[in-house]
């Protein structure tokens, strides 16, 4: 059960926290950079948390992008095991999210990008209300068949870099079909973050399933 579902009627509603996980190089940060303006265009007040092993590289990239007030971007150094701070002990990320909410009381949604990990990466429900897992076609169309916890359990599976499919010999239709099958019909969306394709469909889903606007 998500944090939002556990909020009592007499408690102030906190910002929705949306996790973004996936392997190294799948396009998580590129997705964050596409989601920021798409969410802002719809009037959604947002903030961002990024996780890296021992640096703030992704946070600095987002801050330099000019897409969002740099003060609204927080960095968490995850150490050697990026999954630990989003699953086993998410304290650092919870504290970072709480601090962003204190500093920006109107924030409605926090994008929380994990450090690059493997197909077993998942988010604690103590940390996120909704989480998506990003894979890319360059990793091969057999990724869904491997049934990693990230692929199966995520609220949304994003298949990114779809423009590369013909260049790496991937049957995109088969990949999407098999992903939907192993996920029991839960949503699978295709994106090309380099060109911004598929982003609006993700925002539609977040508005409907997380912010309950539709």
Swiss-Prot record:
Q: What are the GO MF terms of this UniProt record?
A: GTP binding; GTPase activity; nickel cation binding
For this protein, the parts annotated as crossing the membrane are none
Keywords in alphabetical order, please.
Answer: Chaperone, Cytoplasm, GTP-binding, Nickel insertion, Nucleotide-binding
Quote the InterPro entries the UniProt record gives. CobW/HypB/UreG_nucleotide-bd, P-loop_NTPase, UreG
Descriptive protein name: Urease accessory protein UreG 2
GO BP terms, alphabetized: urea catabolic process
Its function?
Facilitates the functional incorporation of the urease nickel metallocenter. This process requires GTP hydrolysis, probably effectuated by UreG.
Organism per entry: Bradyrhizobium sp. (strain BTAi1 / ATCC BAA-1182)
What subcellular locations does the record give? Cytoplasm
- UniProt similarity note: Belongs to the SIMIBI class G3E GTPase family. UreG subfamily.
**Could you say which residues bind GTP here?**
22-29
- Gene Ontology CC annotation, any one: cytoplasm
Summarize subunit and interaction data from the UniProt record for this chain: Homodimer. UreD, UreF and UreG form a complex that acts as a GTP-hydrolysis-dependent molecular chaperone, activating the urease apoprotein by helping to assemble the nickel containing metallocenter of UreC. The UreE protein probably delivers the nickel.
Q: Name one Pfam family in it.
A: cobW
């Amino acid at each position: 059960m998500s944090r939002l579902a556990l909020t009592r009627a007499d408690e102030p509603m906190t910002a929705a926290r949306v996790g973004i996980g996936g392997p190294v190089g799948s396009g998580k940060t590129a997705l964050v950079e596409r989601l920021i303006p798409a969410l802002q265009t719809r009037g959604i007040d947002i903030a961002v948390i990024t996780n890296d092993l021992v640096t703030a590289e992704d946070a600095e990239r987002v801050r330099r992008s000019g897409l969002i007030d740099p003060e609204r971007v927080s960095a968490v150094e995850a150490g050697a095991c990026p999954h630990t701070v989003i699953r086993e002990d998410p304290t650092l990320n919870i504290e970072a999210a709480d601090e962003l909410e204190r500093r920006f009381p109107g924030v409605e949604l926090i994008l929380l990008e994990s450090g690059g990990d493997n197909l077993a990466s998942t988010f604690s429900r103590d940390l996120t209300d909704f989480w998506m897992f990003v894979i890319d076609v360059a990793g091969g169309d057999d990724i869904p068949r491997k049934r990693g916890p990230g692929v199966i359990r995520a609220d949304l599976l994003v298949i990114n870099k779809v423009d590369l499919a013909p260049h790496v010999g991937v049957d995109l239709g088969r990949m999407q079909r098999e992903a939907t099958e192993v996920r029991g019909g839960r949503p699978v969306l295709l994106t090309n973050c380099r060109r911004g394709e598929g982003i609006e469909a993700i925002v539609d889903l977040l508005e409907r399933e997380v912010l309950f606007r539709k």
